[in-house]
């Protein structure tokens, strides 16, 4: 080190320090790679394996999402299945849910999983349902835990700001697990560093906490304000990007409890099975109007009602159930558990990939052949050539 400005500095101590720090970092990296955890005293400290970010479309110009709805995983082999045929019951446990999950990941090879997917090393995100806090953890603790798990891109809540009496202050958002994820264009394209598909995740709550209103919870006004802010921010980023004149990037939304308007889909030409009443809040908080006015959301993906797996359209926005996935949750004997797949496809330009051309969906059944059913186009870019 050099303390006298008149003397020539000796760089060797600094160089030695840098080499030492590099050695420590390399050692920790090797330990993490081999063992996945460090030990401090007698306690194992796990290091999160992070997903590769940003999420982006692959070289084939696609981005595939697996929606795992209502897994209801309990205690492994000790948890018996519900609503299966008599000959299936004696051997059916939570392990059937795990096996279905592994087989569907191998079959579909998704780029992203909406719920949970640590073993597959695929980026994943989770939203809370109405049962998740019924054990020893609060909803906030659960989302904190989920966000710290390997390959998770889940977030507890965003930091957002508002103004009160002319002063900028942090604005609280209801619920836990409200966040958005941006998916970038394919590597090598002019949109490689731009968000061209956006995913909104919302906490739809548990039971109503408002006196005089019974039933399920709902997406609150603070969450909808945040949604509108994010939507406008994405719009502003597009205007400043390399392709400001292209169609606004589409968005998809994920939350658990359906909104009241989903009941109206019984009277439409829905695709799939509508087998039980829509278990929604008795209070309508205006989510549908918010989504319509935002203009970017093309489809919403729901859970909660396990034997509904239909898609129906409301004011230009598709609402799709995932269908019950887990064997410990209720279902219907003889009706296979299922999973929803969502595929976004890019438009092919003269030299490279452009923006999103089409979004479609289908379901896979947990039968002998993972049957593919009810394929449906949800949105096509009107400006695609």
Regions found by a protein language model. Name each.
Residues 1-14:
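Short, low-complexity, Lys/Arg-enriched N-terminal segments of secretory-pathway carbohydrate enzymes
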Residues 14-55, 59, 68, 180-184, ...:
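Binuclear metal-dependent phosphoesterase catalytic core
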Residues 30-116:
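N-terminal active-site segment of His-dependent metallophosphoesterases
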Residues 41-57, 117-246, 339-345:
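Extended active-site neighborhood of metal-dependent phosphoesterases/phosphodiesterases
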Residues 70, 129-130, 304:
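Active-site glycine-centered loops adjacent to acidic/histidine catalytic or metal-binding residues
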């Amino acid at each position: 080190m050099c303390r006298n400005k008149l003397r020539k500095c000796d760089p060797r101590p600094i160089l030695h320090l840098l080499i030492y720090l590099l050695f420590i970092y390399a050692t920790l990296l090797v330990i993490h790679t081999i063992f996945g955890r460090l030990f401090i005293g007698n306690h194992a400290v796990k290091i999160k394996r992070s997903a590769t970010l940003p999420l982006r479309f692959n070289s084939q110009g696609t981005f595939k999402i697996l929606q795992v709805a209502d897994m209801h995983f309990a205690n492994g082999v000790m948890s018996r299945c519900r609503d299966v045929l008599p000959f299936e019951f004696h051997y059916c446990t939570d392990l059937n849910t795990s096996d279905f999950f592994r087989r569907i990941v191998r079959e579909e090879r998704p780029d992203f999983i909406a719920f949970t997917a640590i073993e597959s090393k695929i980026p994943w995100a989770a939203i809370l349902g109405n049962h998740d806090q019924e054990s020893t953890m609060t909803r906030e603790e659960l989302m904190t835990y989920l966000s710290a798990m390997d390959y998770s891109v889940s977030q507890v809540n965003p930091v957002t700001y508002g103004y009160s009496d002319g002063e900028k202050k942090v604005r609280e958002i209801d619920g836990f697990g409200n966040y958005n994820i941006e998916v970038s264009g394919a590597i090598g394209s002019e949109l490689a560093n731009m968000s061209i598909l956006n995913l909104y995740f919302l906490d739809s709550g548990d039971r109503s906490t408002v006196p005089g209103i019974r039933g399920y919870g709902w997406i609150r006004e603070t969450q909808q304000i945040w949604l509108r802010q994010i939507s406008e921010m994405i719009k502003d980023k597009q205007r400043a990007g390399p392709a400001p004149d292209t169609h606004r990037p589409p968005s998809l939304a994920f939350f658990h409890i359906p909104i009241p308007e989903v009941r109206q889909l019984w009277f439409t030409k829905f695709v799939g099975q509508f087998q039980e009443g829509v278990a929604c809040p008795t209070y309508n908080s205006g989510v549908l109007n918010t989504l319509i006015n935002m203009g970017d959301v093309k489809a919403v993906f729901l859970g909660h009602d396990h034997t509904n797996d239909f898609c129906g359209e409301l004011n230009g926005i598709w609402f799709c159930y995932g269908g019950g996935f887990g064997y410990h949750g209720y279902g219907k004997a003889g009706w296979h558990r299922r999973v929803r797949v969502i595929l976004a496809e890019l438009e092919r330009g003269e030299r490279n990939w452009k923006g999103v051309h089409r979004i479609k969906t289908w379901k896979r059944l947990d039968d002998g052949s993972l049957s593919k059913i009810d394929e449906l186009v949800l949105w096509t870019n009107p400006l695609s050539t």
